[in-house]
Amino acid sequence: MTHKELNELLCDMSLEEKIGQLVQVPGSCYEEGAVITGGMNNGWREETCRLAGSTLGIYGAEKLKKIQDDYLKTQPHKIPLMFMLDVIHGHKTVFPCPLAQGATFSPETSEKCAEAAAKETGASGVQVTFAPMADLVRDSRWGRVMESTGEDPYLNGKMAAAMVKGFQGEDVGEKGKIASCIKHVAAYGGAVAGLDYQNAELSEHTLREFYLPAYKAAVDAGCEMAMTSFNLLNGVPSSGNKWLMRDVLRGEWGFDGVLISDWAAVGEMVAHGYCEDNTEAAVKAIETGVDIEMCTPAYADHLETLVKEGKVSEKLIDEAVMRVLMLKNKLGLFENPYKDADEQLEREIQLCDAHRSLARQAVRESIVLLKNDSTDSDAGKKLLPINTADGMKIAFVGPYVEGQDMRSSWSVSGDEKDNVTLKTAAQEIFGGAALAEGLEEKQPGVLLRFAEGCTLLDNHTIVNLGQYDEDNWEEINASLLSEAEECAKWADVVVLALGEHRFQTGEATSRTQIELPHIQLELLRRVASVNKSIVTVLFNGRPLDLREVSKYSKAVVEAWMPGTEGGHGIMDVLTGEYNPSGKLPMSFPYNVGQLPMCYNHYSSGRPKPEGSRGDYNCRYLDAPNEPLYPFGYGLSYTSFEIGSVNLSSDSVTSGEKITASVTVKNTGKSKGSELIQLYIRDVAASRVRPIKELKGFKHIELMPGEEKKVSFDIDEELLSFFRADGSFGSEPGKFKVWIADSSLTEGDAAELTLRD
């Protein structure tokens, strides 16, 4: 439709019909047996469901086409229903969780994953995804860190923009594309004490420097929607924050898409104490510019009366409705209300070979090798990759050896039965089928045994959506631990597969203790008492306290929540088929008491002296200041040497750029890929700058003995920041420049001067 036709449509709509376009109801309102009336059984008025402009949480081409047909029969102007779904890291093919994708440092890979997810989702009849999440995260007590790409605004911005492009392409109306929704605006990840839904208290400077840039990157990439966050931001709920939504999001950034609240966030402004009732919440939300209210009836129940009483301008309603209509028009729904819904394509494309292959590659790239010590028998040989010579005995032990549910939270449409387990992948690689009792398999050259080791959880553990209780928990684990010890005694190498339950991460999963379950640590200790050659593979959605894991393991592999192709991707790395190149997108703390933490913090007036305890300075008495594993860290099966930084000029002025470069050499014995990272520090400024900031990264692949030059451009824009007066720009002065393999790598920095 043309803009003129959309205006004519808007003018012809009744007020009730307009308000309906601003209401989103749960998909259960339209499920089987509900004549567009199922809302009556779900607390929603029949008329609200009949006129609602969008719904969420349901998928399936045949089902959604029927719902659309039934819906359109009741529509005065035949405006199609819009279907939305949480497609966070895949639909039926589940890719690694976003935090794992952050570890790839590959926007290109994330773009491909989003593109594949869009194709699968579109074929299922869904037109909008509530992704990507660009919340900056510094506190792994907060469960939704798994949905972010990490603690760095530069990395998050690159990843968010790539995902938007993958979902939407150049034209969201094209086949195989869906609209994306950047969330959660803003600073949902800044919750006090990592407690979900809690207030975020952040200065405007901190917001603009760290928390807002990734959202803006998604807006600049053309995201069609944005979502308000649940939380208070400096005492004001995001769904009622005019400064944030109208001044910044729409005014400064030029966002002209649809703004939707998170689930019930408009109504929750009453619980926050910001509004007396839903009537006031409706007023504040529409004045803030919230176009669609998700799953609470403040708009449906009160907006019509508020307009008629003159308490809300109908102009505000019209502006919001027009944005909704424009999105439906961009999606092509007026011409084809089903968009890409296609039962045959749905069967063909979901979990297709191409998508599984992409998922496997994404798993490979996301894996971070945290530790790899030498074997006891050969000080010159690392434990990984696993030796698969004749007669080698490998034991796979732990709850994730056969545990299929590696999907992570927010993989709502994936199915654990489609996931490749570690055991399945190991059997495929080494051949043969399991014996009747599943204990031992003889292969040409390799012997395998498998043991569950222990239960995944301690008894009476609370997870999201429930609590784990087992009457015979102690007896079960006594037997499993004994079996694991026997397995470990027999083996040359033990692959220990440990981790969190998928519902220990995600929404509403804040934790004050971030170690592995106690029973898993007991398994680790028991195995270590009989076999020191332990490779621990971790399945988790947040940085954990890994002190014990690191202590008892010769090798530690961070596999995150890897999704559908987890087993294949992990085995590719363990066997050396793929040389790990992932890097941590979030610091792993030494212990929970360090949280929140980040690499790009500010310097103290009393910094802790290098290599000494020091007195009356910025330090902990009982722990190091540094994380156990820092941001940007990750090992390889080969080794790399990074030379000194060379600047093409030691000064730069406005309008100019210089080049910072290093020579990187593969000094090991195998081909490998290294992530070369550019960090910059502003030495002195009107507002103190972080000790180090990521400003660029590049992957480089080298053969043994090969060396290449890696270069980064540096210009005034890269050196700019939010100054003391609140403006964004640069200041003349000195800068330090590092090019390294992690944020903690120390060495001589090159010095650069920015001149007027």
Predicted regions and their residues:
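Glycoside hydrolase catalytic-domain context in secreted enzymes
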Residues: 1-723, 729-745, 752-756
